[in-house]
Amino acid sequence: MVVHSLRLQDLIEEIRGAKTQAQEREVIQKECAQIRASFRDGDPLQRHRQLAKLLYVHMLGYPAHFGQMECLKLIASPRFTDKRVGYLGAMLLLDERHDSHLLITNSIKNDLSQGNQPVQGLALCTLSTMGSAEMCRDLAPEVEKLLLQPSPYVRKKAILTAVHMIRKDPELSGIFLPPCTKLLRERHHGIQLGTVTLITELCERNPAALRHFRKVVPQLVQILRTLVTTGYSTEHSISGVSDPFLQVQILRLLRILGRNHEESSETMNDLLAQVATNTDTSRNAGNAVLLETVLTIMAIHSAAGLRVLAVNILGRFLLNNDKNIRYVALTSLLQLVQSDHSAVQRHRSTVVECLQETDASLSRRALELSLALVNSSNVRAMMQELQAFLESCPPDLRADCASGILLAAERFAPSKRWHIDTILHVLTTAGAHVRDDAVANLTQLIGEAEELHTYSVRRLYSALAEDISQQPLVQVAAWCIGEYGDLLLEGNCEETEPFQVEEEDVLALLEKVLQSHMSLPATRGYAITALMKLSTRLRGDNNRIRQVVSIYGSCVDLELQQRAVEYNTLFQKYDHMRAAILEKMPLVERGDPHVKEGGKEKQTEAQPLEVTAPAPTEPQATKLLDLLDLLGDTSEPLSSGHAQHLPPQTPSPGEALIHLLDLPCTPPPPAPIPSVRVFEREGLQLDLSFMRPLETPALLLVTATTTNSSKEDVTHFVCQAAVPKSFQLQLQAPSGNTIPAQGGLPITQVFRILNPNQAPLRLKLRLTYNHSGQPVQEIFEVDNLPVETWQ
């Protein structure tokens, strides 16, 4: 009995009419059974109709793999209606990861060779969609012939198919290189767009092609100039802009050809200025062309005035009502802040206004750019804006904002008092979101500023009395009260509001910290130690302190219990030594000195900081990488691995004698740190070399050098690094993203790693790149670094 089969339109209506998912599955299962039966009967007139219904079922997410062989039969059919559905089914149902797709190679070859343009177009579309590297190598000669066909319809599709072939197998570049120059002379916009895309792909994957196509820069400039000066055309204009797609693609190609090549850059400078000044910005099409123009100007050797014009265009984008355009402007300015810092500074006020954006992505990008714009001349004004933003910013931005403010204050603080005030404000506003080393840095800073001890202890005492919920603030205040409690009681500070503090008030405040449920065990440890130190600084009876300390002798926290037992023993057995043991901490040399940009600035507050050479401003978002979950705890020392390390240099007896006499001595230059090869695969090698500046012992400069000895280029190379949480990592921009084959110019990238605790260093690296047409990703840990990198 013949079962009536639904038409495609009827099947769609019936599926859409299903009220439940179960009804939909029932309809589809019933129809799939009829489709299978029709395939078994082998009716050639119904095959393409049945496959069309099966493709619709596949689009809904239901299995349709049993139709793969029917696709092959339809492709081999001489009828165009069969081929059309067969090729569509092949693009949807066949996968280059399975060998079944290779069965259509011969059919595609035959269709490409015949003169039927619609059939050739179907074959080219299928090949460019799911053609594997093997298919591309077999069919490249046929596609090359079609590049010179008189029909623009076929040539457009052949050009785009060639782009796919080069992506799958870069070795095919030599086949498609010669026809490009001739194709570029075509006046058909579709052919021009495809040709520019093909040349771009060739230049990105083949250095020889890059050198070859630099000769056509004048031709590209002329094409773009014609587009800019041409009036309105109904065929090509979009929102009043003449073919913006072709303009954008030409600008991208010019950016590649002009990078690191002065002659090509000079050829396109005038044109870029013309595009930047004449493009209409009232519609998105014009904004897209302007953005590509700006990126091209900044990537090539352009004139200084042209670069300023590009930054001003981005500044106008910041005032646009479209949030997407503002986000693009902030992102582009963040990329340009390294090369044109002064030009970006002109738009600082507009960038700061973007901090108040309601969109989280915009405010985050504005925060990163604002932190990157901080320098010694604007640090006071910028810190006021950032501190105001910190008070009202969303919780997910508070940690980044607080960390960025602390880092900027560390580098550009105009005075120690200003630095202390800034950190105190951050701890008071967002103490729970600061880095782990903020407490240690502030205590060290206060310890160094002897003239600010009274000011600091009184400020911290007042802040602690108002709020004990911010744990970092409580820890710093407890430490400072313990060290300088005598100044709190006796000292007078003109820079703070006068108030009288009694011994009972100080002890009661520390007891409140100990009893608070919000206090962490570490905070209670600070408070107990502060009480012990106050026992030698206060003139009253110490019985109250002894009673409080003795309570924690039975604490469930082992650290607090041990500390309390030791302090009780100090009271009972070594009371005569207590004053000497609990005296003020000596000054500790800072491992990360203040770095500040050159230039004179008036110092109106206490103790100006020393001015040193500037460090490059980096986006703060890349400075702070919390990688605890990637590397785990790093408290234990790591194995040194297989690298050959040099022993540390021991001082000579004469040098030791000079140190004993406290005479000035110039330290000998440090021994060079041996480099380490951390990665090697298929001709790609990654070596790390190290340097520790004498003036900043806690800073390690790591230079990652990547070389390629294979026979094929490595493209789209990206190296990312991660460090444990106790370190601070700053990744500088790499020298490029393409490594030429057979020992070409390597890629170098510098990592700035700050290790204030001198902990054993280990890295986690992730490499992503394309090699032999295949994407590669490698993730590995490096734990064989020389001991000289941290000791």
UniProtKB/Swiss-Prot annotation:
Main location (coarse class): Golgi
Domain of life: Eukaryota
UniProt keywords, alphabetically: Cytoplasmic vesicle, Endosome, Golgi apparatus, Membrane, Protein transport, Transport
InterPro entries, per database record: Adaptor_Complx_Large_Subunit, AP1_complex_gsu, ARM-like, ARM-type_fold, Clathrin/coatomer_adapt-like_N, Clathrin_a/b/g-adaptin_app_Ig, Clathrin_app_Ig-like_sf, GAE_dom
Protein name in the entry: AP-1 complex subunit gamma-like 2
GO biological process: intracellular protein transport; vesicle-mediated transport
Subunit comment: May interact with AP1S1/Sigma1A-adaptin and AP1S2/Sigma1B-adaptin. Probably does not interact with APB1. Interacts (via GAE domain) with RABEP1, NECAP1, CLINT1 and AFTPH/aftiphilin. Interacts with HBV major surface antigen L. Interacts with HBV core protein C in a ubiquitin-dependent manner. Binds ubiquitin.
Source organism of this protein record: Mus musculus
Record function comment: May function in protein sorting in late endosomes or multivesucular bodies (MVBs). Involved in MVB-assisted maturation of hepatitis B virus (HBV).
Occurrences of domain GAE (ranges): 671-786
GO cellular component: AP-1 adaptor complex; endosome membrane; Golgi membrane; Golgi-associated vesicle; membrane; synapse; trans-Golgi network; transport vesicle
Membrane association type: Peripheral membrane protein
Family label: Belongs to the adaptor complexes large subunit family.
Entry comment describing in which tissues the protein is expressed: Widely expressed.
Subcellular location: Golgi apparatus membrane; Cytoplasmic vesicle membrane; Endosome membrane
